[in-house]
From Swiss-Prot:
CDD domains: TM_PBP2. This is Probable ABC transporter permease protein PH1215. SUPFAM superfamilies: MetI-like. It is found in: Cell membrane. The chain crosses the membrane at residues 10-30, 72-92, 106-126, 160-180, 215-235, 261-281. Pfam families: BPD_transp_1 (PF00528). It comes from Pyrococcus horikoshii (strain ATCC 700860 / DSM 12428 / JCM 9974 / NBRC 100139 / OT-3). It comes from the Archaea. Probably part of a binding-protein-dependent transport system PH1214/15/16. Probably responsible for the translocation of the substrate across the membrane. Residues 68-284 form the ABC transmembrane type-1 domain. It is a multi-pass membrane protein. Signal peptide: none annotated.
């Protein structure tokens, strides 16, 4: 194999980026893991190695288990909800509806907004006294549907999940629509000649070929559900009480509000391990797919 004459220049341009990534990503990760095995507490970096003490404390921390439960609830509802709604919207747009470009823009617009803007918008809609939802129910005479929404600890987490699905469905719709449009037209024509209905066309031709788009979107949604800090922080700040705490919020409060850096680092390490469980199989699958 001949070496490209541009290889030295490519390496030269990559070195600064690799140095920055090495310092601010990989070194930071290793340092965080090391700190999680110490007793660093307070602004002064004075600490001693204590082994698994921070992780043992996590096991007996009820807030940690509440946060973990909320993270799992977020994964179980937000991820499939975003995938299914995105697939539904993509199929609708693929049916050659009028003003497709306009509808596509409308569906994608929520994802183009920052999480802070979206959370602020939904906080206004969920406001118990003057929010759009309660005002609308009041005007329609449906007072029994009025609720405290994000101020009700029983449903606050579900309200957050609905808002997140609304924001991310446009992203999954674009992923699926691109996958659908990449299917060769000959497959559609062959199925139509065989007398396939529209439902059979999507069930047996389209959906089975959307594995790659589904996995790509799945990984993105999973990783976001583990670190959805800014959205939830703006919307509820983890409240009422700890009803909408997730691991990222507990990590933030332990690290910056309580200056318990070692404990916050232990929570961050747990988040890292959860993310690796999702990302590593995907990278392996992608690598094997390229080899084939």
């Amino acid at each position: 194999m001949r070496r490209s004459p541009d290889l030295p220049y490519i390496i030269l341009f990559l070195i600064p980026a690799l140095i920055l990534i090495g310092i601010f990503v990989y070194f930071a990760v290793v340092w965080n893991i090391y700190i999680s095995f110490t007793d660093w507490r307070g602004l002064i970096p004075s600490y001693h190695f204590v082994g698994l003490a921070q992780y043992k404390q996590l096991i007996h921390d009820p807030i940690f288990w509440t946060s973990l439960r909320n993270n799992l609830l977020l994964i179980l509802l937000f991820v499939p909800g975003s995938l299914l709604l995105g697939l539904f919207l993509a199929i609708l747009l693929d049916m050659k509806v009028r003003f497709e470009s306009g509808f596509r823009t409308i569906y994608v617009l929520p994802f183009a907004l920052s999480f802070v803007v979206t959370a602020t918008l939904w906080a206004w809609m969920y406001d118990p006294s003057s929010g759009v939802l309660n005002v609308l129910f009041d005007k329609l005479g449906l007072d029994f549907l009025k609720s405290g929404w994000i101020t009700d600890p029983k449903i606050a987490m579900y309200c957050i999940i609905i808002a997140l699905i609304w924001q991310f469905s446009g992203y999954t719709m674009i992923i699926y629509l691109a996958g659908i449009r990449s299917i060769p037209i000959e497959q559609y024509e062959g199925a139509l000649i065989d007398g396939a209905s529209t439902w059979q066309l999507y069930r047996y031709i389209v959906i089975p070929q959307l594995t790659k788009p589904t996995l790509s979107a799945f990984v993105v949604l999973m990783v976001f559900s583990l670190k959805a800090f800014d959205f939830i922080w703006v919307l509820t700040r983890g409240g009422p009480g700890t009803s909408t705490f997730i691991l990222a919020i507990e990590m933030y409060k332990e690290t910056f509000a309580k200056t318990n850096f070692a404990y916050g680092a232990a929570i961050a390490t747990i988040l890292l391990l959860m993310a690796l469980v999702v990302v590593l199989p995907y990278l392996y699958w992608s690598y094997k797919g390229e080899e084939r």
